[in-house]
Amino acid sequence: MFLLILYAFLTAVVARKLSAAVSVYRYRKMHGLLLARPLNQKGDVIGFSLFRGMQKSAREGLSLQRHYENTQQHGPTISAVLLGKSFISTSDPENIKAVLATQFQDFNLGERNDAFAPFLGRGIFTEDGPEWERSRALIRPSLSKAQVAELPIIEQHVQNLLSRIPGDGSTVDLQQLFFNFTLDSATHSLLGQPVGFQLSPAGSEAERFSRAFDDAQAFLQVRAKLGPFRGLVRNKAFEVNCQLVHSAVDRYVSEALGRSARPRSEDGKPGSMRYDLLSELASTMTDRTQIRNELLNVLLAARDTTASLLSSVFFMLARHPRVWSRLQQEVVQLEGQRPTYDKLREMRYVRAVLNEALRLFPPVPTNIRCATCHTSLPRGGGVDGLQPVFVANGTIVHYSIWTMHRSTAIYGSDAEEYRPERWLQESDEAPLRPGWGFLPFSGGPRICLGQQKALTEAAYVVIRMLQTFATVQSRDQRPWREHMGLVLSSFHGVQVALRHVEG
């Protein structure tokens, strides 16, 4: 009996494999598709050695750079097997455009929901299909122009930030301060009141919330990398951190549901027509868990993306005094006044500095999608790598914004250099129009709703820093190394020294 059952099982497996192979053959023949160039994985049938190599690179803070170097050898689009799953890796802008926009319906987030669910639940960054569309529609109103331009709230938290930065030339890690600042500004914008981390003493509830938030999201990256094996790993600290963050946000949700939604002013008090996201959600939903999930999904992006950008900006400014000096020349035109929303838009060099930091250090430097059907990508097949390639149902497509942003075909021979002027038409060189070659905030239907808010806040902080400090110097000459959480940051922080403007 046992042998009969085993025989039936093996027969079913073989039949399923043959059926899949026939399906692939017919689809490829019908559409004239080639296969992407395979990575040499001799003896590594399930891709475990590849996984170990990737983990080693990540520990060394070099995974992004090594991917870029590999594309110089193998081309921008390759196929491989990783932990038993077929995947294609690409940095070709046409392929990324297909995945994110023109063939959007052929791909979903894959296992992201399972990996992130214990912390983020179901929300805009973990859902697909109608549920994602519903979440996006709920969140969009809170990121209108009126919300983007809430400069008085930003100023309040900038003052707290500036009070924490020594101006006597002593060394400070700006990266940590920026993440503290954006936690306050993001929670103020989303919850109607800040957690108050910047002004809280060590051991406070706000500090515990911040630490739990950071540690929980860091472990999400581990869960994502473990793929189908994530269920075998239990992390008690992760569970405790999730519970702490959930309990804290649930208190805000309960307060919001306990009162009717009402107009709020820019400082969060009753008065004008400003609504924070929590009030918006509480006025249209009653499911406490779903409200919390949506808030955490947006908080993760709103807080970490801006902090990542600011850290990259000042990491480079501390090493490029010429750029700092030119920024000063532009900012001095404000004559010490706080920038208005209209003035922010006029600061062309400030925007160029932000764009160059986003190019070299995109906050989300890589991402993945999963094919939901047999489909294709525009390029990567054939000897020249320019022919369409087949993508089987279930294939993981990994795309690297980091590598694409270093393409000499898009950015010229100096693509690896830091040069904000490339974004300004100031010489005989052709104006830079990278199109789908510049995606710091993704693209297509899932493009980041908060990109203007992030750019506004980052520009405001840069200008206020320039108005406060006369000089900035690097106090760490080690080369930049990545720290990959859900967003990119510097492994060594941003160790600098600043001196106050005299008078």
UniProtKB/Swiss-Prot annotation:
The keyword Disulfide bond does not apply. Residues 1-15 form the signal peptide. Pathway: Mycotoxin biosynthesis. The keyword Heme applies. GO terms for biological process: antibiotic biosynthetic process. InterPro entries: Cyt_P450 (IPR001128), Cyt_P450_CS (IPR017972), Cyt_P450_E_CYP52_ascomycetes (IPR002974), Cyt_P450_E_CYP52_fungi (IPR047146), Cyt_P450_sf (IPR036396). Its cofactor is heme. It is an enzyme of class 1 (oxidoreductase). Its EC number is 1.-.-.-. Transmembrane segments: none annotated. Keywords: Antibiotic biosynthesis, Glycoprotein, Heme, Iron, Metal-binding, Monooxygenase, Oxidoreductase, Signal. Glycans are attached at N180, N393. Pfam families: p450. One of its GO terms (molecular function) is oxidoreductase activity, acting on paired donors, with incorporation or reduction of molecular oxygen, reduced flavin or flavoprotein as one donor, and incorporation of one atom of oxygen. Heme binds at C448. Belongs to the cytochrome P450 family. Cytochrome P450 monooxygenase; part of the gene cluster that mediates the biosynthesis of burnettramic acids, an unusual class of bolaamphiphilic pyrrolizidinediones that display potent antibacterial, antifungal, and cytotoxic activities. The first step of the biosynthesis of burnettramic acids is the hydroxylation of proline by the proline hydroxylase buaE to generate 4-hydroxyproline. This is Cytochrome P450 monooxygenase buaG. The lineage of its organism: Eukaryota, Fungi, Dikarya, Ascomycota, Pezizomycotina. The gene is buaG.
